[in-house]
Amino acid sequence: MKRRYSWPIGIFAIIVVLLIALHIALPYVVRDYLNGKLADMGDYRGQITDVDLALWRGAYKINGLKIVKVDGKVPVPFVNAPVIDLAVSWHSLWYDHAVVAQVQFFNPEINFVDGGPNKQNSQTGKGTDWRAQLGKLLPITLDEVQIHDGKITFRNFNSRPPVNMNASNVEASIYNLTNVVDKQGKRDARFEGKAKLLGHAPLETSATFDPLSNFEDFQFRLRARDIELKSMNDFASAYGKFDFNAGHGDVVIEAQAKKAQVSGYIKPLLRDVEVFNWQQDVENKDKSIFRSVWEAIVGGTETVLKNQAKNQFATKVELSGNVHQQNISAFEAFLQILRNGFIQAFNARYERPKPDAG
């Protein structure tokens, strides 16, 4: 009897040992495989520290993802994602008979950098097909993406003063990435997000888009409220050569694209604004007389434009452009259109043509 059962027990023991060895080795195999894929990302290079597998629930966790720019001197990574959790959607598997996954990013950070005249020192994501890279990192069809306590920054390390703008506490979700075509022939994914702009101002944003198109058809909305303008002084000083002494503001953006043609607007509404302050600006030895004169001009322009009854003023800048631009992706082209519109919204300009001489 003992010999009769010894072979099955031995085989079972070998299988158990092999499974344990596979369980121990597999995370390292997956990690090295992913690092090999992330090493070749065009202008960027990625690396992860380790992988945790939970095969019993059809999930795995990626720890310590960092993506950095290869060329140029950029002191911060483009992407820093401490934890990425991917799990098969059992609801979709059971009810829709589809193998799709939900992915959650915990405490991710994305850093955009303006390098000034030296474009190699800029970091915008240009030079890499990010949809293809996401497919390498998460090789399964995604239905839903969630972001928890994320952060988005805009930096300029070479400007005077250096610029560090950010949106923190980002909570966002993207739904229906694998949506089928509806009755109207559309395939719309939905994005919803909230954050704190500059650490204090509530920001809300939403969008709908076709996940399988090249960002040619979409609708986008963003609103930030109660921005303390003094917190934008580094940005205003570096790009507009003035700073705020007081005031609060809101910003609303609405944009849409149809067949790659973008339309929309940016509308800032500023309240109780003070730009020029004699004690702060003229008596401040760190500021030149020319800087003080410029701030006085900007402050004077603000006085002319504002609604005296409500002590507020607003402007509206129309957005237009095409997302098909040479050498950059459609998404980058849209961000460029937004950036140009935002700068234009805060630049003083004449509203009527110059009168004829004589």
Language-model segment annotations:
Residues L38, V51-A54, A81-D96, F112, ...:
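Extended lipid/amphipathic-ligand handling interfaces
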